[in-house]
Amino acid sequence: MKCNTLKLTEQDQFINKIKNSESQITSFYEYDASQKESFDRRLKTPNNGREFHLSRVIKSYMNELNLTHQQLNNIDALADGAKVVIGGQQAGLFGGPLYTFHKIFSIIILSRQLSEKYDTPIVPVFWIAGEDHDFEEVNHTYAFNNKETTLKKVKYHTMTPPDSNVSRYTPDKNELKASLNHFFKEIKETVHTQDVYQMCVNIINQYDSWTDIFKGLIHEVFKDYGILLIDAQYPELRQMEKPLFKEILEKRDQVDQSFRETQIRTTQQQLPSMIQTETNTHLFIHEDGMRQLLNFDGTYFKLNKTEKRYTKQNLLDIIEREPERISNNVVTRPVVEEWLFNTVAFIGGPSEIKYWAELKGVFDTLNVEMPIVMPRLRITYLYARTKKLLKQYNLSIESVIANGVEQERQRFVREKASNNFINEVEEMKTQQQELYNNLLTYVENNHDNQLLLEKNNQIHLNQYDYLIKRYLLNIERENDISMRQFREISETLHPMGGLQERVWNPLQIMNDFGIDVFSPSTYPPLSYSFDHLIIKH
């Protein structure tokens, strides 16, 4: 496998602005991610004193896994005060979209580069967002069906979706295996299929909760890189977070005000408003089997799904006795994460790093310094067959990844069509319009006849448009093989109108290239980059 960088012309220039240190963007972060001085300064910040306790919690969380010596070494390094590079993601079905793996690679690569450059251990940590409760975001994935050259949605079906954190949810193993069977039914069978399939079955058999199954897959793929894993909803981690939960509750007004004020400043700089929330408390509580948002009405903290209410002291007591019932929303989660870890850099997706720009005031209010915020690597896999098709149709990979193939596909069809035929029909449309204009002069004093004439004219014009449309459709049918190939290019490099990594599932790559495709012995050596990466097989 080989890797090349690619400079895409992107509509969203946010990451390029970070790369170019534009003050419009960098002013909303503590550090300029593109400057070496930022790393020099961040690495000199004193530790928070929680690293040893945190290493014990992570070791406890990962205890049921068969840890590699790389992981054990990193747990020891963390206990000894090593700083971390961290990022997180929801626990998607079968690993979720490819960008989950790419985020983990970003964490691993940046931590390795910093370790080598500064001659000090920097530990890669992946944060599983098990406190999230939006099951519809994680219960499905997509498989590319080669025979039909289309993407197929694969979903875990249940009549009782969870109302609380996904970490609390135990899926039906038979239904999960049915979803797995559906996935492998859609993709082509290769020499690697049985190995990848059996790996997934073993993981489903071994673990019970939704996030533990996800953890098992991530560990299996990335264990040899030394990645450390932690679930945001892990009870022992919640015990550590009690002091900050209490501070967030005590400073509820200041936290909310600082968030709102910073968000206003970002929109004044023509940045999009990323965080949409009406709460003024920015914490959830597990109550009546549901994860419910807290909101202060001036006297009590009320819930968004039931009538129950609390005083501040009620909540402080719950935090002290049962901190696992409390969880963060999008505003407080980043601060809690960085309060726990001695972080050099946080790795986020494009949307994440945008909404972090709205949170600097919250970090300052809670006396937690925002780490360096870095965009994750963006990667596309280029199959040999796809490369051949690009050459066959003289298509630029940069253009296809950014914009798709529809314009080129339509041009191909037009070139196969008869220009004389289309021009004659267009001329007939022009004549029809002229006839309409002439006839209109005879009925200018009769409103009903004007409407009749207008309707009749539109019917004729629509028929001519339909004639051209059906004529071109017949051309497409005559060139069915080429149409399928255009569709294959699109669904591979620009699926659903976006990047491959936002739709395709990692299991598909493993099925095509091997169960060890993401392992250190097979995956190409990468360096951290703001540019788009192309990995060719």
Curated annotation (Swiss-Prot):
**Which parts of the chain are coiled coil?**
415-439
Q: Which GO terms describe its molecular function?
A: ligase activity
- Name of one Pfam family that matches: Rossmann-like_BshC
Superkingdom to which the source organism belongs = Bacteria
Q: Which UniProt keywords apply?
A: Coiled coil, Ligase
Q: Which InterPro entries match?
A: Bacillithiol_biosynth_BshC, CC_BshC, Rossmann-like_BshC
Catalytic activity, EC: 6.-.-.-
Report the top EC class in one word. Answer: ligase
HAMAP family assigned to the protein according to its UniProt record, in alphabetical order: BshC
Give the protein's function.
Answer: Involved in bacillithiol (BSH) biosynthesis. May catalyze the last step of the pathway, the addition of cysteine to glucosamine malate (GlcN-Mal) to generate BSH.
Which family does the record claim for this protein? Belongs to the BshC family.
This chain belongs to which protein, by name? Putative cysteine ligase BshC
**Organism ancestry:** Bacteria, Bacillati, Bacillota, Bacilli, Bacillales
